[in-house]
Amino acid sequence: MTPATKLPGDVGPIHFVGIGGIGMSGIAEVLLNLGYVVQGSDLKSSRITQRLERLGATIFEGQRAENLEDAEVVVISSAIKPGNAELDEARLRGLPVVRRAEMLAELMRLKSNIAIGGTHGKTTTTTMMAELMVAGGFDPTVVNGGIIHAYGSNARMGQGEWMVVEADESDGTFNRLPATIAVVTNIDPEHMEHWGDFDRLRDGFYEFVSNLPFYGLAVCCTDHAEVQALVGRITDRRVVTYGFNAQADVRAVNLTYKGGVAHFDILLQAEGQKIEGCTLPMPGDHNVSNALSAVAVCRHLGMKREEIRTALAAFGGVNRRFTKVGEVDGVTIIDDYGHHPVEIAAVLKAARQAIGTEGEGRVIAVHQPHRYSRLSNLFDDFCACFNDADVVAIAEVFAAGEDPIEGASRDDLVAGLIRHGHRHARAILNEDDLLRLVREQTRPGDMVVCLGAGTISAWANGLPERLRG
């Protein structure tokens, strides 16, 4: 056994089906750093698979039964279904097939762990937690759901006793993670294809917190009504709350924005202390809220107030979370993963804060809906979440393998936005149409915010060069 896991060191080659996925690759990287033999397949090469290859992994392009010739263990995500050539081969050969969350849980066994849960904000919060803990000298191991700019990876191998992980609620497997400290950022209706209804999702988060050991800690955002209700259900675990409201144990006050930078003070109400003059180099009330959770945990672990203030000011961000990909002729291009109405509203509010109330800068939102089922289930919310955008452009739905649903198309959403009173909503066909829109509609001082979990990220990243061409 290695010092960091109960996994036998001679378990044999561990094969990841879909190793380039953001959730799978971080686990693979940690295993490589621990000395395990790692291999995996993905449909195409990417920066992530190339990085893993440099670290020593064997990478197969395409998924075929013969890729498992040397494998002894096979790791899959919930996206891998029967009929996948590699999964079928693993079961035919009687190889152990391990869910992603089970393998992550194995890595967590002999560490003290901080699991970041919530419908939105997990990746950014995990990144903030990691960066504050590094600055505080805790040297954590990290497995995140996004690329952390400070590391150029979604994983970090540390020598300290703490591990920070993003806890994904989408398939319920976050309740298998042996957390010591659990963070809950918010709870909104999402991933109903797994949970079935909102009550079951609520119960899932209750179980997430209830699984903590008696010496554990729940860190909860009580600005969110559902999380506040969850806190009311917790009767036998310690709880620390955070937020902007007057009852929060860790509270942000005096929040202002200047040049896209948040300025605020933090009240540590249980301690009777204050951290004055904090800055966070990214806009958005939701980002300040996420930072408070990291402050709450790091303060609980003994980090000094001055260390916290310095670390917040140096925060480097995370890929696809309000990421500036370029500026052309005074027009800023932003790429963001937001694909749920709550996320979209928060990002557009942040964009409005970033350009400021002075001047004539406008926010142009470009959204590619992700999954017909999400658009259908939350249609009215989608129609009302773009209010901070001056112009809204909607691309074709990124199906993610789903069949179309009547009433949940690109054109349905555009019509719905107009019915809900949006003055400037339109459909776009493709990347070329986006280029025309930006050239025709923008002026210096504007911000173009590309939102979605599908191919729109590539559109956003290619846009600055195409505008210059």
Curated annotation (Swiss-Prot):
Keywords: ATP-binding, Cell cycle, Cell division, Cell shape, Cell wall biogenesis/degradation, Cytoplasm, Ligase, Nucleotide-binding, Peptidoglycan synthesis. Coiled coil: none annotated. One of its GO terms (biological process) is cell division. It is an enzyme of class 6 (ligase). InterPro entries: Mur-like_cat_sf, Mur_ligase_C, Mur_ligase_C_dom_sf, Mur_ligase_cen, Mur_ligase_N, MurCDEF_pg_biosynth, UDP-N-AcMur_Ala_ligase_MurC. One of its GO terms (molecular function) is UDP-N-acetylmuramate-L-alanine ligase activity. GO terms for cellular component: cytoplasm. This is UDP-N-acetylmuramate--L-alanine ligase. It comes from Ruegeria sp. (strain TM1040) (Silicibacter sp.).
